[in-house]
């Protein structure tokens, strides 16, 4: 017999915490510790919400919602980011477990004035979320790439220089093609604060402040290629195009990489990043939403107007 228990992060007992991390690591092939759990799910409220699927007093599944603060037309609203959804394979006989787990969470979210839940499901379950759980699709996140070294580091620093020379004509074309776009038109803005960065950024993430600019990135390897994932960039002067150029220049100077990747709707007059064609994307990244407040504007607002990038949801 299974049951569902909804708790806040600060209400999870030590035995539940140990049990959860074991199930989580098994589901995602990771090795987080109970200590990681506390910091991972901290939010501006001080906690997240967890819906545990329990069988024989063991946690065998979970849905977590992290409260996040946004500004809609400069008015503060609260959203919930759905993350770390899993059900262990031997407990998937009931196809409605996930639906029941999420529905059990909703009253707690509404009680905390959370007006929407948002998620980026993988391709294996995205249909379930939209057809069974009745989430609406806002759109798909773009892959934007900046090529640093087409020689993949084989000829040292010369590779970056030659790459810049070879791509110069394409950069000019890109600048012309993106003329007229404006990142500042985004009406749904993620609220960035010191508390947000404290719980969002991990040890592997780099937060750089220099010359009035701020950038956040993490370096990883994708298919044996060294990649810098640009999470966010901004300028104290409000010039995002200049901040993007400064971010790319900094990363190129500091890291041995071949590509810089920015995932999200860039919407900026710039020449450094190219939007990857849909047929070349490694996987689709649909953004889906559950409107908890019956706010029609949320459902009708295209993803281009959302400030939604790896800084919001990435689990790296």
Give the residues covered by each predicted segment.
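Short loop segments at secondary-structure junctions
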Residues: 56-58, 88-91, 291-293
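Mid-sequence acidic-hydrophobic segments that form the walls
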Residues: 66, 85-88, 104, 108-112, ...
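Conserved acetyl-CoA-binding loop-helix of GNAT-fold acetyltransferases
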Residues: 87, 92-109, 239-250
